[in-house]
Amino acid sequence: MKRTSNWIAASIVVATCAVTLTATGSINADDTATTPTSEVASSEAGDDSASTPAAQPCPSTSAPVATEAPASSNDVGDGTVEAVEPLEIAVLSPDYAAQPAAKEAIDFFEAAAEAHGHTVTVVDTNSDNAAMNAEITTAVSQGVDAIVVAFGTPQEFGDGLADAVEADIPVFGLDTGGLAEGILVNVTTDNGFLGEQSAQAIIDEIGEGGTVAMIHFDPFEPVRLRAEAARALFEGNGIEVVEYIQGDPEDSTGFAAAAVGDLLAKYPAGELDAIWAGWDASALGAYQATLAADRTEILVTGVDGQAFAIAEVATGGNWIATVRQDWDTIATTELGLIEAYFAGEEPAETIVYVPAVVITAENACT
């Protein structure tokens, strides 16, 4: 069951391999759309001659289905967790509707948990981190067995987390923006790796020297860590970061498209080599802007490995890489930790990292 913080049911659909874009560059969440983003970007700009080929879906375009979680996954404990009674689990997030990656991870978790007989309620506070406190308190008052805080900035959830601790209700982090008192464990990806590998894809293409613009978001710790790692690698290779732009997660694609459009006017051909974006929804806006301006000499990279990103990377155009976070494994690992806890096994670590994969045109459809 899903609801927004005011109990209005959310209905959000994300395309599985190609998405369409609105005129402002935001994602049009229509899973029936088949028009590739590069085609749409070109036609919106009144230019059908963009040099990047239209994205073609990879051979399988069906939506991903969560694999059933083992009783204990990713070497959680000794791997012999006994079956637990069905649980009531509240999944609370400020980012379910706003971020495709959050939706994918939460949907995987919900599917895996329900396959194990648990009841899951998903609550979206619509980009409002502060509202998470009230939602955690509400979940506590409803007597749920466990709470999952997914994405968001848990340092802002202090009051709600305190209520959960007082009620002895365990709270688990699903790719949250770091740890906070009251969260037993956070299952995530090594964000330093994500930043370095997405930056390395650019370095491999342009070599030492050159110029890059970066779209980051410091308030969310995972993206901040990615950006710090990427910037350090760029600067270590003599690449100048000429623009360091704070993105907008509430309108990731539209904001990035507008910001990069301005950059392209500021930096004529030959003065900007690449754009690094800390998450795919922003990379999509940057990519769209380069297509619309016929500036496909500028490389783009993203992070998350969303289906729309992989579809574009597969074309061999100027969106050259994304780094795929394994949301399925992140979700099933989270479930394994929850079930282990209720079988009497405390998490051995406060952070569990799940490996990520660099996606380029060579492996995008494999």
Describe the function of each predicted region:
Residues 2-13, 21-366:
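A residue-level marker of the well-folded mature domains of exported/periplasmic proteins
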